[in-house]
Amino acid sequence: MLMPKRTKFRKQQKGQFAGLSKGATFVDFGEFGMQTLERGWITSRQIEACRVAINRYLKRKGKVWIRVFPDKSVTKKPAETRMGKGKGAPDHWVVVVRPGRILFEVANVSKEDAQDALRRAAAKLGIRTRFVKRVERV
């Protein structure tokens, strides 16, 4: 699963979700992509499940790019622990996504195959997404 090799601080604050995505809003590497329509957290396990779903459907045809990386640690206190006594230990890693962010890109496959593969991957996520094509930018 994806996680940073090293971070400056082990624990992070929750942060804010306001606004639209600041970067990665266009399909830059492949021909088709999956774009978010909602904001939320996507865990490293969800990213891995999406990657496996796409690769299983495409069966070595085409190329897949993962455009997000989980760089935020989420902490969790042990079960049946009373409140207080500080923040819990880091439990898993997430990426914060805002509307408009491209999550995955695929190339060298037909539009129908790309749509089906990305639809299967979207079922693994807890947020709404849409299928987008590459547009020429000057």
UniProtKB/Swiss-Prot annotation:
Pfam families attached to this UniProt entry: Ribosomal_L16
GO biological process: translation
Record-linked InterPro entries: Ribosomal_uL16 (IPR047873), Ribosomal_uL16_bact-type (IPR000114), Ribosomal_uL16_CS (IPR020798), Ribosomal_uL16_dom (IPR016180), Ribosomal_uL16_sf (IPR036920)
Molecular function GO labels: rRNA binding; structural constituent of ribosome; tRNA binding
Gene Ontology, cellular component aspect: cytosolic large ribosomal subunit
Tagged with keyword Ribosomal protein: yes
Keywords per UniProt: Ribonucleoprotein, Ribosomal protein, RNA-binding, rRNA-binding, tRNA-binding
Key word Isomerase present: no
HAMAP family attached to this UniProt entry: Ribosomal_uL16
Family: Belongs to the universal ribosomal protein uL16 family.
Role played: Binds 23S rRNA and is also seen to make contacts with the A and possibly P site tRNAs.
Subunit structure as annotated in this protein's UniProt entry: Part of the 50S ribosomal subunit.
Name under which the protein is recorded: Large ribosomal subunit protein uL16
Source species of the chain: Chlamydia trachomatis serovar D (strain ATCC VR-885 / DSM 19411 / UW-3/Cx)
Lineage summary: Bacteria, Pseudomonadati, Chlamydiota, Chlamydiia, Chlamydiales
Gene symbol of the encoding locus: rplP
